Amino acid sequence: MTQASDCSSEKTLSEAIKGRRATLSFLPDPVPENDLKKILDAGLSAPSAYNLQPWRFVVVREVEQRARLRRAAMNQLKVEEAPVVVVACADLEGWRSGDLDEIIRLAQQHGYGDEARHASMRKNIANFFSAPGNAGGLAPDFAVWANRQTMIAMTTMMWMAEVLGYDTAPMEGFYEDQVKATLGILAHVRVVALLAIGHRKGEDKRFAGRFAMQRTVFAEKWGNPIP
């Protein structure tokens, strides 16, 4: 795979946000390894409550595997066309099976807090996610919380891809059981979304307009439009 990056097409974040459209069809041109790593690293740098990072990502690039994934994704052509499809997942058991230990180790490595704080982190995280009602009552269940966290990370990847000059298509249309079977995803892991990355073939969707801020953003109380 070529290592060259088409830096001439890089955008500012503002340009990426304003100009992004869901890409309907992709060229087969590969995404260079160094650009892909930048995209993935951006997602791994996303905010995460308690630094738990419940997200997991399966990067699908092989032609045959993309074709199989397409069948599990409601036969969407872009899944097979895009040179890279990132399958965003949420690990519902990671914090119980090693992630919490790694969080503490990383905190120690980076000089974050002392032993008392690390002990408190371990206790508080375990208590929070073991509490009746799950997630301390802040979410209907742990899967909902992990899904939210994973979407933040995947969206961050999407913006980095757009900044680097690539086109993207986030997708929620798939059969989770089929995606899991195709990719060998474990039972305690949820498939959250798919993100196709590449260069568009033809035109993107035309801009269809967005609600005015006064319709969707309120000041201080619900229903009070922001000035």
What are these regions (language model features)?
Residues 1-227:
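Acidic, surface-exposed loops and disordered segments
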